[in-house]
């Protein structure tokens, strides 16, 4: 085994993947390259936080679409990691090349594929919102099938699982889909071939050859155990078309929360966690009250009433774009967040006056969570996002609003650490 595994972190944000991998094994995992670009903002705050903490790697602050192939080609990364946006993955025939495909401009998944084509890493670990598996609404599962086909075309297998961090002992009910992608010429892939593949491909569809992989042998099964049977016998197999455009136009299939794609076929099961791990309650990650600044308390009656209204049930008459009226209804939720339960999913709007913001009551007073508490919900070190380094080298403080925005976009780093722990075991198996 190499003395170190070199990592390229794409869509790096403030470094969640890097924290997770380094917390697993800082001597083994070396993030030598990163890319972070916020297209909708003039200031590049997330990049500046990342660069403050990790000045020694090659940190690229430009639109990934503008990074030339030649730069990727020079990166001898063993692993690519990243959490990428959920977008429209549909493809069409290229007008310049009838045999080629063309994704919609600005869809960043295709930049991952471009990087993989140039770098040819052994492994990828990727993250996205769980609704990706059901997108788009009019052709459920199509986008994910396109992604699987793209990796298959490059000679990779893909294992996936939707993971709710709270179901594996963390302090936030955050559901995300994680992918473990591995090249088909790795020793791990060859080992899986010997164990699960059959010379008669039809057997794959008539049996449950990959059940043992999904329930026991796969990366996610080892670190995030599940009950050994599908929910309501929900399982499906599907042979992907060799034509990605055909998948884009005609895919009709099922994708459950757990699965494996190998050699152009996928097997998917709807699974449930063993629930053996107790989540950390919200109350346990709160700062000591004497350290909480008064600005986080909500004392204004109008703001208190606004929170009460937003969290309450309501029926509102609205008018559609076409002009017809309809009733928008919203169920009620508890007036404040239960400190005995793990936190809810943080959004980028955390800390503003809205329904999704955490709103807590302590000793008869109401307040929002602090930036440090937001960092703890994502398993980041305290004050990780407090400072950033500007292009002129000056270090300045980051606003609370931006710190909350960062954490709403981030991932639970302890989940990443566990994935990295198991990847290390798999790499050792490759010896």
Q: Language-model features: where?
A:
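Basic/polar N-terminal segments that are highly enriched at the extreme N-terminus
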Residues: 1-2, 431
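Core alpha/beta nucleotide-donor-binding catalytic domains of modification enzymes
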Residues: 2-120, 129-144
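Extracellular structured ligand-interaction cores
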Residues: 4-7, 174-178, 341-343
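Short, flexible loop/turn elements at secondary-structure junctions
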Residues: 11, 38-39, 130, 162-167, ...
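Class I S-adenosyl-L-methionine
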Residues: 70-77, 89-333
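Short loop/turn segments at secondary-structure transitions that flank enzyme active sites
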Residues: 83, 183-187, 352, 383
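C-terminal target-recognition/interaction regions appended to catalytic cores
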Residues: 251-431
């Amino acid at each position: 085994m190499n003395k170190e595994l070199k990592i390229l972190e794409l869509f790096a944000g403030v470094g969640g993947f890097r924290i997770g991998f380094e917390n697993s094994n800082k001597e083994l995992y070396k993030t030598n390259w990163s890319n972070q670009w916020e297209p909708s903002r003039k200031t590049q705050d997330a990049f500046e936080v990342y660069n403050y903490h990790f000045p020694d790697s090659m940190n690229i602050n430009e639109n990934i679409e503008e990074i030339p192939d030649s730069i990727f080609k020079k990166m001898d990364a063993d692993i690519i990691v990243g959490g990428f946006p959920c977008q429209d993955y549909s493809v069409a025939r290229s007008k310049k090349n009838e045999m080629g495909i063309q994704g919609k401009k600005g869809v960043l998944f295709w930049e991952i594929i471009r990087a993989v084509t140039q770098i040819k890493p052994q492994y990828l670990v990727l993250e996205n919102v769980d609704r990706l598996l059901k997108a788009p609404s009019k052709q459920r599962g199509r986008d994910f099938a396109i992604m699987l086909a793209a990796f298959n075309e490059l000679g990779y297998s893909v294992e996936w699982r939707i993971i709710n961090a709270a179901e594996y002992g963390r302090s936030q009910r955050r559901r995300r889909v994680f992918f473990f992608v591995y090249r088909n010429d790795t020793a791990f892939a060859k080992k899986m071939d010997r164990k699960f593949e059959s010379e008669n491909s039809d057997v794959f569809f008539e049996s449950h050859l990959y059940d043992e992989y999904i329930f026991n042998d796969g990366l996610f099964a080892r670190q995030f155990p599940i009950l050994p049977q599908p929910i309501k016998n929900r399982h499906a197999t599907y042979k992907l078309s060799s034509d990605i455009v055909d998948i884009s136009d005609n895919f009709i299939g099922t994708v459950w929360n757990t699965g494996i794609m190998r050699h152009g076929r996928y097997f998917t099961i709807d699974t449930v966690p063993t629930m053996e791990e107790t989540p950390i309650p919200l109350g346990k990650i709160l700062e000591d009250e004497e350290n909480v600044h008064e600005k986080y308390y909500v004392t204004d009656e109008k703001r208190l009433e606004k929170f009460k209204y937003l969290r309450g049930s309501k029926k509102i008459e609205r008018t559609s774009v076409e002009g017809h009226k309809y009733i928008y209804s919203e169920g009620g939720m508890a007036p404040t967040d239960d400190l005995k339960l793990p936190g809810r999913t943080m959004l980028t709007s955390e800390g503003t006056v809205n329904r999704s913001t955490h709103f807590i009551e302590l000793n008869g007073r109401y307040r929002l969570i602090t930036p440090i508490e937001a960092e703890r919900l994502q398993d980041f070190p305290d004050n990780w996002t407090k400072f950033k380094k500007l292009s002129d080298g000056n270090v300045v403080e980051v606003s609370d609003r931006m710190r909350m925005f960062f954490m709403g976009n981030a991932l639970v780093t302890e989940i990443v650490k566990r994935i990295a722990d198991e990847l290390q075991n798999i790499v050792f198996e490759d010896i």
